[in-house]
Amino acid sequence: MAAFGGPAKPLLSLNPQEDAKFKKEVAQVRRRATKQQEKQKPTPGVIYVGHLPPTLYETQIRAYFSQFGTVTRFRLSRSKKTGNSKGYGFVEFESEDVAKIAAETMNNYLFGERLLKCHFIPPEKVHEELFREWHMPFKRPSYPAVKRYNQNRSLVQKLRMEERFKKKEKLLRKRLAKKGIDYNFPSLVKVLHKNEENASNTGPQNSRKHQALRKKKKAASVTPETPEKAVDSQGPTPVCTPAFLEKRKSEVAKMNDDDKDNEIVFKQPVSGVKEETQETQSPASSKKKRRRKHNQ
């Protein structure tokens, strides 16, 4: 069995004189076979999938769309800043016909409380770098410069930082002087120290005190609305000029009008009053008639 193992040996004809012809024929047969295989291979189709829920990942979406056919490539677009899903992606199927069927069936399909939007992308409009590094798992972007700047520094590191700021400040002032610009600005190191002091002073206790003081100030500023101004009898009396008297009369008239409007008056009909007068007069007339009869 060991003799049959190993790489395949080159094909040789039985007649050594016709070896060259035999090799040419074999090459032609192989070319025809490859061409037939290429013709039989279906052209791939790409579809756009929109309104995807943010909780879905690449593996889940690919597994879902693989029920229509073999998915060769898939790309879910993500934000470069946060790494979160943008809500749309691209799916490439092995066959173009399968891609069209998947786009038709999944368009306006209720998926995770959302209507999916799917449409077929023609091969002319598919970008060459659409599926670049599609097999690589997405990593959230890290910002090392921001982390370095916000890290907690020791005293030595802070002193080095101050020296760097001073050098930059000197260079800036020299450049401005060369260009003939008279501009004075505060040193950057002092500004940094002020910011650090403010950050240290604003603690949880200080912030609570500030909030309590602000609340007290607001309560003092908001005065209760008095409906009428109280007149102080012991205060100084105003000068009685004719203009002042006219103003006072107009104010009193307005007050009376307001009081009249507030009062509710019920008016009784006139017929009822007449009936009451007749009823009250009837007993007196009947007594007079009785007296006359008695005298007769």
From Swiss-Prot:
**Could you tell me which residues carry Phosphothreonine?**
226, 237, 241
Q: Where is this region: Disordered?
A: 1-45, 196-296
GO molecular function list: RNA binding
Comp. bias regions, Basic residues? 207-219, 286-296
Composition bias, kind Basic and acidic residues: at what positions?
18-28, 245-257
Q: How is it modified after translation?
A: Phosphorylated.
Phosphoserine modified-residue sites: 221, 233, 250
Name this polypeptide is given: MKI67 FHA domain-interacting nucleolar phosphoprotein
Q: Which organism is it from?
A: Bos taurus
What gene is this protein a product of?
Answer: NIFK
